[in-house]
């Protein structure tokens, strides 16, 4: 009997209903007139407490609650791979087709497509005895993964009917099984399974096979086992954000600091606060500018964000740009190839002097701005800021002053003063007279109302050089109006230098010139800022790479070159709007500060002290791409929308290195953003792990990545608070530890159900995002009690450009002894001994560095200095790995062991040489050291192995030289 009740209380995502007699714990119910999806999480008599997976705004007491008789379950069958779901397995692409970009409340859609036909290949025949877990058929779901159709757990008997090879939908019966009781069970290609119940298996195996990732610091020093659990701290601070003083050009507020923009918009929409982060989903999106389809155009910003970062990167360019962003904020580099303009994102912490970043040259758009003509007295005022008014303002801002009721414009060219006077008469109905002053001729106009109008437009009344500002109306005007102002201001010169004491005014000028596609340079001289407008020159250059020959061409030369190779579109469209500015200085500022961001449709916006392209969004892509797991489940749990967008855009672009096919063909994405109801965030973890267990049961090795479990725990905290439960540490529920353990314990390497012997695994890698990088907070501490591997990301290593930035002193793996037999049997019997010896060297280096800080390196004995030399080689030549190099991005196990053997052989020979009296300076000069430094970029393992003989030969020569 289906339970039916009525709502008596609504508190955020929690709803209390009475009249629910007969309902069960964890039963799915439909809530309210809209039929919102909810789950019963507490029963008290006939009252049910329900967590609702959709927004409950507008739901009122008295509305119905109807039970479904089923628990929260997922559909498991062909169609899972390549799909993108929300936290309760609703297919987001299907829902988008139904309701648009936002999920309408109460909308449902089947998780697996019902009309698509799959090619079924039977693997069993009539008369076969089967049990739960047996494979009765296969479906080639993607070009990488074959989907095994299994008998659901709990069903056994004899096959009395099975479909022939052919194409079927998942709703068609493909087999019938007669149970021992005589009941006929119909089997389809999909099954349902409750997410909070782990799928059964025969036996749990010890985690003794490593999950090879190709990352040396992980595989060699802190290995993850198949079926194991690991935690990795997410990005410290607030991700890809900018400094609060960063200027943003908006249609509504003109050029404004992003901090002030946030303060103006804070709370004007749905606001979310989590720890030291807060953001608002705007009711009315604002208009900013961004790069789209080769042009800088108007775009909508839908969210504003504020957080805290533990440090910032400040980048200065040749034209005077100053960009202050978080280390993982992305900027754009680019070059022209035979295929056109290729823009590439690069993290700020990877930018170095000499790099060229894409910056804004020309901003399109603009409209005539209406002027306020109220309270202007006897004069007339134009309705809009037109070309003639812009020209008048240009002359005034360049050579004029406002005094009490008087405007004076100075110039020795009387014809120019007459032009200004005629403009004043035409625009305002007020004229003046030309007089001879001590230092030259001047046009004097006496009109207090006109002074008031001009002051309202932003013309400073006194100390103009300090208070000079570009009128907001002018920044938003079309290019013809801006051109009229600029021509008047610089009086037709091709080169001009404008000196201002106002830093803000100088930067506003750079935006104004960008409306015309004119780039400027800004430099500081004493207390003044010099804005220089020049002809095209060495600054307007294009990085070109055609026929494998990188070049840097001046823009005009590139235009001619472009015609010869068919790239006119690049020259005339894209490169009219952006230029490549050379980086001259990069420095890290290790001070915590507030940071800000806006979310836009193009994932970039124009901002900075001078117009610059800024990205608005740590990934586990490297692990997903290179680990030898066959299926990847990625759960974006409570991530901000722009970060989840990054994942949804980047994953489809990744190629599976083993097959060359898209990585999505072996991936399931679960996208549950922070602005979705917290209850769905809580469910997303269970949805993901259940799908992972299903592929495990087929015999696959599955890697599940949960990003981030900290935000999942925050969802538990909010729900617990609304349930009025006794809070534990920092407000988290007392059962936080058991919930985390329950999730991680579903990982494992197992013998699956079924008549045959089949082994599969689920390896869980959970990202934790401790506020401010505080590893002592409850989520991290409770996670560390459960997981066996901890990869500690180190911000200091990242600042020093050491990647992967995993700290070898604070990370650990409890699987080292478990996987050593696999390494010894399959790769090298001395793997564990070499690994321990290398770790001891790195730990000894850390101890010695403490002494060096006090007394300096020269005070150390030769032997200790030799340890520092070899440990540095270990760090730079082994632990450091280049994810952007096609060879070094993935290091096979055999190569890892060979590289380690080369380095430890060098260490042994170094110690022998020191004992035999060879000076360390001579050892440091050995040519083989340079070859060892390059071995990571060598594919041929035999060539790397040959370095051992070279090392021995060169040391033998040293021994002979010193008679040792």
Swiss-Prot record:
InterPro entries: ATP-synt_VA_C, ATP-synth_a_Xtn, ATP_synth_asu-like_sf, ATPase_a/bsu_AS, ATPase_F1/V1/A1_a/bsu_N, ATPase_F1/V1/A1_a/bsu_N_sf, ATPase_F1/V1/A1_a/bsu_nucl-bd, ATPase_F1/V1_b/a_C. Keywords: ATP synthesis, ATP-binding, Autocatalytic cleavage, Cell membrane, Endonuclease, Hydrogen ion transport, Hydrolase, Intron homing, Ion transport, Membrane, Nuclease, Nucleotide-binding, Protein splicing, Translocase, Transport. Its EC number is 7.1.2.2, 3.1.-.-. Its main location: membrane. Residues 392-518 form the DOD-type homing endonuclease domain. This is A-type ATP synthase subunit A. The keyword Nuclease applies. Has multiple subunits with at least A(3), B(3), C, D, E, F, H, I and proteolipid K(x). PROSITE patterns: ATPASE_ALPHA_BETA, INTEIN_C_TER, INTEIN_ENDONUCLEASE, INTEIN_N_TER. SMART domains: HintC (SM00305), HintN (SM00306). The lineage of its organism: Archaea, Methanobacteriati, Methanobacteriota, Thermococci, Thermococcales. GO terms for molecular function: ATP binding; endonuclease activity; proton-transporting ATP synthase activity, rotational mechanism; proton-transporting ATPase activity, rotational mechanism. It comes from the Archaea. This protein undergoes a protein self splicing that involves a post-translational excision of the VDE intervening region (intein) followed by peptide ligation. It catalyses: ATP + H2O + 4 H(+)(in) = ADP + phosphate + 5 H(+)(out). One of its GO terms (biological process) is intein-mediated protein splicing. GO terms for cellular component: plasma membrane. Belongs to the ATPase alpha/beta chains family. It comes from Pyrococcus horikoshii (strain ATCC 700860 / DSM 12428 / JCM 9974 / NBRC 100139 / OT-3). Component of the A-type ATP synthase that produces ATP from ADP in the presence of a proton gradient across the membrane. The A chain is the catalytic subunit.
